[in-house]
């Protein structure tokens, strides 16, 4: 029985060491997707006002909780609340990024997560999520007619994109080499933007929506040179998007980029004629669906040793379920349906992020199983059946997958077009 008391004391120490930020009954005995399910389903159903009422930043923490709150409030057209929440998450991200060294509390939290589950770790937003943070901050500034504020955010978003690309330069170059070996024709956008021609791998790392919106905002501010830079980047990411092609060719023609325009026309056909002073362009950006939420895969394995001592080894990992993308009605103009092209596939970005993290997740899972087993064996060795039983129950209840991600983002973004 003494070891049972010691085990209880060890568990108590782990919980206290983990700190208050991520410690909750939900994080101990459940996971984020389960806790956020009502909110997620309300957003999927388009019931944004209800989702806004249900959402609580306590579930996701200061960063992720405010990501969700900012996005839901934006969908509900509650722009002041959206801006406030996204600014709060932005400040929290800056604090996280500005830490020069690992603090004692962070080390304790990491130790706690190895004894419990990864939900006790501080949430580290993915690169694509940081890009969307600045995108929606920028759109909120546009709602206030603050073009300069929106431009500041797209510049920050572009810095995130550049850092993400450089961090994966080796993988992108490898993907580019594979495409060349398969005889795939060169992506002209990649050539013009000096980007790796990495096909779907590039679009899972770089956000065409961000680049295109950035180009539009620069064009609105009469900075066509900067707009052309981002249009070319968007073309590198989404080389078949008709709206991106049109905007890139329009900017090249307006700027007198003759060689670029020649290459563009050779690849895509004649550039569209310019607009006269009485005409304007209407750009439609269509956010569709809701990004997939991570789900938990779990298995409990009862195993007995030579002495007949039983143990339950629990494994829990996050995964994205394979579901077909829902179909949405085409945008219509004057009763005529407009064909649309994909500008961003957020599900692909989310899946790529999980793929990149999965090795680390599995390693931590293996270490956690080993650490928990050492405690269990100590209990079994000293003949403390109560301690052994308590540990098995604790292990089974607390082994939860880390399913945290920004779950209210769109599934994909499209641009209806009419050339």
Placement of each model-derived feature along the sequence:
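C-terminal soluble interaction/assembly domains
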Residues: 359, 374-419
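Alpha-helical linker/edge segments of TPR/alpha-solenoid repeat scaffolds
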Residues: 76-84, 106-134, 177-223, 251-283, ...
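Bacterial signal peptide processing site
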Residues: 21-24
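Alpha-helical segment of the N-proximal tetratricopeptide repeat
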Residues: 29-57, 68, 217
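Boundary/linker segments of alpha-helical solenoid repeat arrays
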Residues: 62-64, 92-105, 161-173, 235-263
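C-terminal motif of bacterial Sec signal peptides marking the signal peptidase cleavage site
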Residues: 17-19
């Amino acid at each position: 029985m003494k070891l049972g008391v010691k085990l209880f004391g060890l568990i108590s120490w782990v919980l206290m060491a983990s700190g208050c930020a991520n410690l909750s009954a939900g994080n101990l005995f459940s996971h984020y997707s389960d806790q956020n399910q009502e909110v997620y389903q309300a957003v999927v159903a388009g019931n944004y006002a209800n989702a806004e009422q249900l959402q609580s930043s306590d579930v996701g923490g200061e960063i992720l909780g405010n990501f969700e709150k900012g996005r839901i409030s934006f969908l509900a057209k509650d722009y002041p609340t959206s801006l406030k929440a996204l600014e709060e998450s932005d400040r929290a991200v800056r604090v996280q990024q500005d830490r020069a060294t690992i603090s004692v509390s962070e080390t304790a939290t990491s130790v706690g997560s190895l004894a419990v589950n990864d939900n006790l770790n501080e949430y580290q937003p993915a690169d694509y999520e940081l890009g969307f943070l600045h995108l929606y901050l920028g759109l909120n500034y546009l709602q206030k007619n603050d073009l300069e504020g929106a431009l500041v955010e797209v510049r920050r978003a572009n810095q995130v994109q550049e850092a993400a690309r450089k961090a994966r330069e080796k993988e992108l170059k490898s993907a580019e080499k594979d495409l060349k070996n398969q005889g795939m024709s060169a992506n002209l956008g990649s050539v013009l933007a000096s980007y790796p021609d990495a096909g779907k791998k590039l679009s899972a790392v770089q956000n065409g929506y961000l680049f295109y919106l950035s180009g539009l905002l620069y064009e609105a501010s009469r900075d066509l040179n900067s707009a052309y830079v981002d249009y070319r980047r968007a073309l590198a990411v989404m080389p078949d998007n008709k709206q991106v092609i049109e905007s890139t060719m329009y900017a090249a023609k307006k700027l007198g980029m003759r060689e670029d325009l020649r290459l563009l026309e050779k690849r895509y056909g004649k550039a569209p004629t310019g607009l006269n002073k009485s005409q304007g362009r209407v750009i439609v950006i269509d956010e569709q669906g809701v990004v997939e939420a991570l789900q938990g895969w779990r298995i409990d394995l009862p195993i007995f040793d030579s002495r007949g001592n039983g143990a339950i080894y629990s494994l829990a990992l996050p995964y994205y379920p394979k579901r077909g993308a829902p179909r949405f009605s085409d945008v219509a103009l004057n009763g005529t349906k407009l064909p649309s092209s994909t500008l961003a596939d957020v599900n692909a970005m989310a899946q790529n992020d999980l793929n990149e993290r999965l090795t680390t997740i599995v390693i931590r899972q293996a270490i956690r199983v080993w650490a928990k087993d050492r405690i269990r064996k100590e209990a079994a060795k000293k003949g403390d059946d109560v301690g052994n039983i308590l540990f098995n129950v604790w292990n089974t209840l607390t082994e939860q997958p880390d399913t945290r991600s920004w779950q209210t983002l769109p599934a994909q973004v499209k641009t209806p077009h009419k050339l």
